[in-house]
């Protein structure tokens, strides 16, 4: 069961946080800021929230990791100050008065079991593996494919399926909600293939990332656009509905160049210069 995460300071992030204070530190802000949505944005939201609370002792920032679709709806209904989405807003969502602000970019890494000999796949091959029209033998491996995907409404899933052209046609062996469950499913099954945020797969044992059309998923290739499977990390708010002073201050700082190093430390690619 998902639980609201109230951000707590961690010793591991102390050095990074100390070097990247939010603007307006100690200006008397107080109150709470609620964020809700993308599980892929967890590291980014946690490190930004921790720094902001370090600088503003009377502010509490909460993060509810419900998935992009739920976060967008939370922003629309006003049950969260800031919705979190790891995909761009759809036209229908914009027509409902929602506004997106891209704070970072993230590559969607394609992962296989560490024992799988396959090292590179094209978008067309990925589509074939996920729709069931090909097995591992067609791309240098052997046996059936156990395609692992995210739940309906996941921004990671929406991004992956849109880019690979597999919307509505994937044949999934497992459909999982948290990113960690996808990593574990691939780690424990030699026939599995999955996808996850770049920041989530780095350094994980038992899995490996494959290149896509010869391009590795790295910060550099995401930023320069050469890696084909990437998506935005988005703050979602309501047009014409002002945030509280505290929430607006957090929003402005998180979307600025002042927060860029923290976003980078969380494994994403900042968009602010």
Regions found by a protein language model. Name each.
Residues 3-23:
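Sec-dependent N-terminal signal peptides of Gram-positive bacterial secreted proteins and lipoproteins
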Residues 1-3, 56:
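Low-complexity, intrinsically disordered short peptide segments enriched in small/polar/basic residues
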Residues 20-69, 73-273:
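Exported/periplasmic ABC-transporter solute-binding proteins
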